């Protein structure tokens, strides 16, 4: 329980549900646990954007794996403890 309380998560945006599901399955095969969810409001200007949620500690490895697999991804965000999003690299 406490582990989840202090765990930091990140989101990788995908342009469709299909791409988000492909990304999550690819990461799962590589041993990285992730979930697919609708992207939070404000994370994208597109209406049907989905996100892959994973531990922040696995973000860099996940981006490499998805790039190698040829899965298109969008912006990445860290989920802050107060519920806000912080774009990675800004």
Which residue ranges define each predicted feature?
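C-terminal structural segments of small proteins and small subunits
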Residues: 56-90
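Amphipathic, hydrophobic secondary-structure cores in small proteins
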Residues: 8-11, 15-28, 32-63
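Short, Lys/Arg-enriched N-terminal segments with co-localized hydrophobic residues
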Residues: 1-6
